[in-house]
Amino acid sequence: MTGFFVLAIYIGVFVVSFFLVTKVVHRATVRDFTSLKTVTFGDESAVRPNRWAGVISILTIFLIWGMFTGSALLPKFLHAPAPFVGTAEFTYTAEANGQRDDATVTVLVHPREQDVEAPEVAPGDGFAKNDSATIAQWRTGLIRVDSNDEITKADGAEVVAINGQPIARGETVKIDSGSVTLSDKGTPNFAPSRGWQMEPLYLPPPEEVWTRTVQVVKEGFRGFTLWEHLGYSLFRVVVGFFFGALVGIPLGYAMGLSNWFRGWFDPIVEFMRPVPPLALIPLVIIWFGIGESGKIILLFLAALWIMAIAARSGVSGVNISKVHAAYSLGASKSQIMRYVIVPNSLPEIFTGARVAMGVCWGTVVAAELVAAEQGAGMMIMVASRFQNTDIVILGIILIGIIGFGIDMLMRYAERILVPWKGKA
């Protein structure tokens, strides 16, 4: 249910911001001859990212993150319903030897980081006595209501109603602050209302992630600084991608220009392309060991097939009329390669390079499973074992930021080196 509301909020913000920003920008646009210029639908070269959309998109993600984690950075009226914290009460009816008696259970639901004592309650009259217990928020607890009763379950007593509603074993009764389920052995199990907010074990609020980030920057993680972890990951990714491109691009050119190369390597490339790098980890360990070479080879294989296919596709997409025109002007094969095939295939190669770099960043976590002592992927895997979700999120964010930065650099290089992309 929480996931549905998150998706609904995200879609709602997208739609509302689209119409509002479009309307405001349209009104603020100066009416001149330039404003009359139209862009043909399908002209990809004329499409530019809307900066307002990018800013609103990032703010929306942080807003939703804060809403559903109860972040102190947001005003409370923006928070999603929180889990119940406070004192909850319900009555139970015990039946024994044909007699019934009611008693009250008082449960103190406390924040997860606090250690509190159960409230004191008067025992009351009758064979069923009042009880008290403590339960942390987001948790459930069995309440042995017969532990202080005059007639216990061993004597034949049984809970038959909660707040006056009949209940049998395995059934649940809703109360204002949660629900009570009667276990298979007849013991009430109280579950406080969980609300819509995520438990910090699964998704900590932004300020907790920031606090842990500052701590890791100052103290490091498992004997290495944060920058050393990121540096090792970046080194592995760059080296693996470099060798993948170094082998893959010439292989792709050969497959695009030679029938023999296409027939020889096409089955291999198309067979290996859908194989996930994770599936290769056991073989990489067996063949290359658990050292640094195994991790780099795994990243090399992740990039190799993508770059080969991108180069082959780039060659296949060269307009044959350009080749004929070059031949008619007396160009040699080497000149055709240098001045026609390579320039016209570069857009596809850059696209493949961006995809391959993204795959390498996704694979670095798996590569650093191979007995790594440093790296962002190693940080994530070690933190996940100890349920340090804040470090896991920190590692994911850093990998995403670095990957995004590399992609921006590659886009910039593409604009400089391939200015003719998208032009006839």
Q: What positions do the PLM features span?
A:
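Loop-to-helix entry region at the N-terminal start of transmembrane alpha-helices
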Residues: 2-12, 74, 228-237, 286-310, ...
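Transmembrane alpha-helices
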Residues: 301, 334-366, 390, 394, ...
